[in-house]
């Protein structure tokens, strides 16, 4: 009887094979159902964001370009990383090289998301605190360059972190069929500073300044400050919309930080951190689930996103000239 209760081997014909994780049937069914729904939601909602910003010309703005980069990262997370992490329950069946590629993509996409958050904070800082020079300093060309550099830096950082794993994909395996990567304390500290503490410090400094300016602007509007010219009244309206955008994107950043804190707290507490193991699920899934929360925030706070969803779902997006439709 005891032999029957032991977890089965991932590869029965190999003595050094890992063993499958065994969970109660109801727990497994509930976990797979909930996480599968989250994965589908992540893919669909982020795809809607990508289609919306790419298709409609009115949405081709510098801020939305940053949201597009973030949506692409979140979409790939939902399409590639989350299903593989859900499927991996102690048995990795896709080979060592695919394991290394899987961990690389996880590092890359998380780093890109962090970089996009920093760029969004910089964008809002200039828009709110230095609006006179926003259109001249923040151009589409410069934002595209920053987005490209963000992805390239994230790739370089991920390759450096995983340099040993990429050379020898099976070096961290304790049994055949395992997909893990061990981060040493020194490497974890570098990763912590580069992808969390440093960006959080930058975001906190920039948004604290944005908050102060936004509060002063809100007080000025409530006190009915006299507006002399039409140009100034338009500037006030523009500032009001910029402040509203800053509030929405501030919520996106706060949610991201809340979802990331548990993982980095574990990284700080441990002398070495096991990445990709089946038992390291809770904090990693919190980071993954953040990818589905961003478009949900857009639904509640961005009227243009709700309008574009209607265009896409009703297939009006296929009509000639739909890219020039008014969605703002």
Model-derived features with residue positions:
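Seventh transmembrane helix
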Residues: 202-203, 255-268, 282-328
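Extracellular N-terminal segment of 7TM GPCRs
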Residues: 1-44
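Cytoplasm-facing ends of alpha-helical transmembrane segments in multi-pass membrane proteins
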Residues: 43-54, 71, 75-82, 108-132, ...
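Intracellular effector-coupling site of seven-transmembrane GPCRs
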Residues: 212-259, 263
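Extracellular TM2-ECL1-early TM3 structural module of rhodopsin-like
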Residues: 24-36, 62-122, 127-137
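Helix-to-loop junction signature of class
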Residues: 35, 39, 52, 76-91, ...
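Alpha-helical transmembrane segments of multi-pass membrane proteins
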Residues: 39, 69-78, 146-158, 195-200, ...
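Loop architecture of class A 7-transmembrane GPCRs
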Residues: 10-22, 91-103, 108, 130, ...
């Amino acid at each position: 009887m005891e032999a029957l209760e032991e977890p089965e081997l991932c590869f029965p014909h190999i003595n050094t094979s890992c063993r499958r994780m065994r969970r109660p049937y109801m727990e497994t069914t509930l976990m797979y159902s909930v996480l599968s729904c989250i994965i589908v939601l992540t893919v669909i909602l982020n795809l809607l964001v990508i289609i919306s910003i790419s298709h409609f010309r009115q949405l081709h703005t510098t801020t939305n370009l940053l949201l597009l980069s973030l949506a692409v990262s979140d979409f790939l997370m939902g399409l590639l990383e989350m299903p593989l992490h859900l499927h991996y329950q102690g048995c990795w069946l896709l080979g060592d090289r695919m394991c290394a590629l899987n961990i690389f993509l996880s590092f890359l996409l998380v780093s890109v998301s962090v970089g996009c958050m920093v760029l969004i904070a910089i964008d809002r800082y200039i828009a709110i605190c230095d609006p006179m020079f926003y259109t001249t300093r923040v151009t589409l060309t410069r934002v595209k360059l920053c987005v490209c550099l963000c992805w390239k830096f994230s790739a370089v950082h991920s390759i450096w972190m995983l340099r040993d794993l990429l050379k020898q994909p099976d070096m961290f395996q304790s049994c055949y069929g395992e997909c893990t990567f061990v981060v040493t304390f020194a490497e974890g500290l570098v990763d912590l500073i580069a992808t969390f503490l440093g960006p959080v410090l930058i975001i906190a400094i920039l948004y604290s300044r944005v908050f102060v300016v936004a509060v002063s602007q809100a007080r000025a509007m409530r006190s009915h400050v006299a507006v002399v010219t039409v140009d100034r009244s338009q500037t006030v309206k523009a500032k009001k919309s910029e402040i509203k955008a800053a509030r929405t994107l501030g919520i996106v950043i706060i949610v991201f930080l809340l979802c990331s804190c548990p993982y980095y707290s574990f990284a700080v507490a441990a002398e070495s951190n096991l990445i990709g193991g089946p038992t390291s699920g809770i904090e990693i899934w919190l980071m993954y689930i953040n990818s589905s929360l961003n478009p949900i925030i857009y639904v509640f706070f961005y009227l243009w996103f709700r309008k574009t969803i209607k265009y896409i779902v009703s297939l009006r997006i296929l009509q000639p000239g739909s890219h020039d439709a008014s969605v703002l």
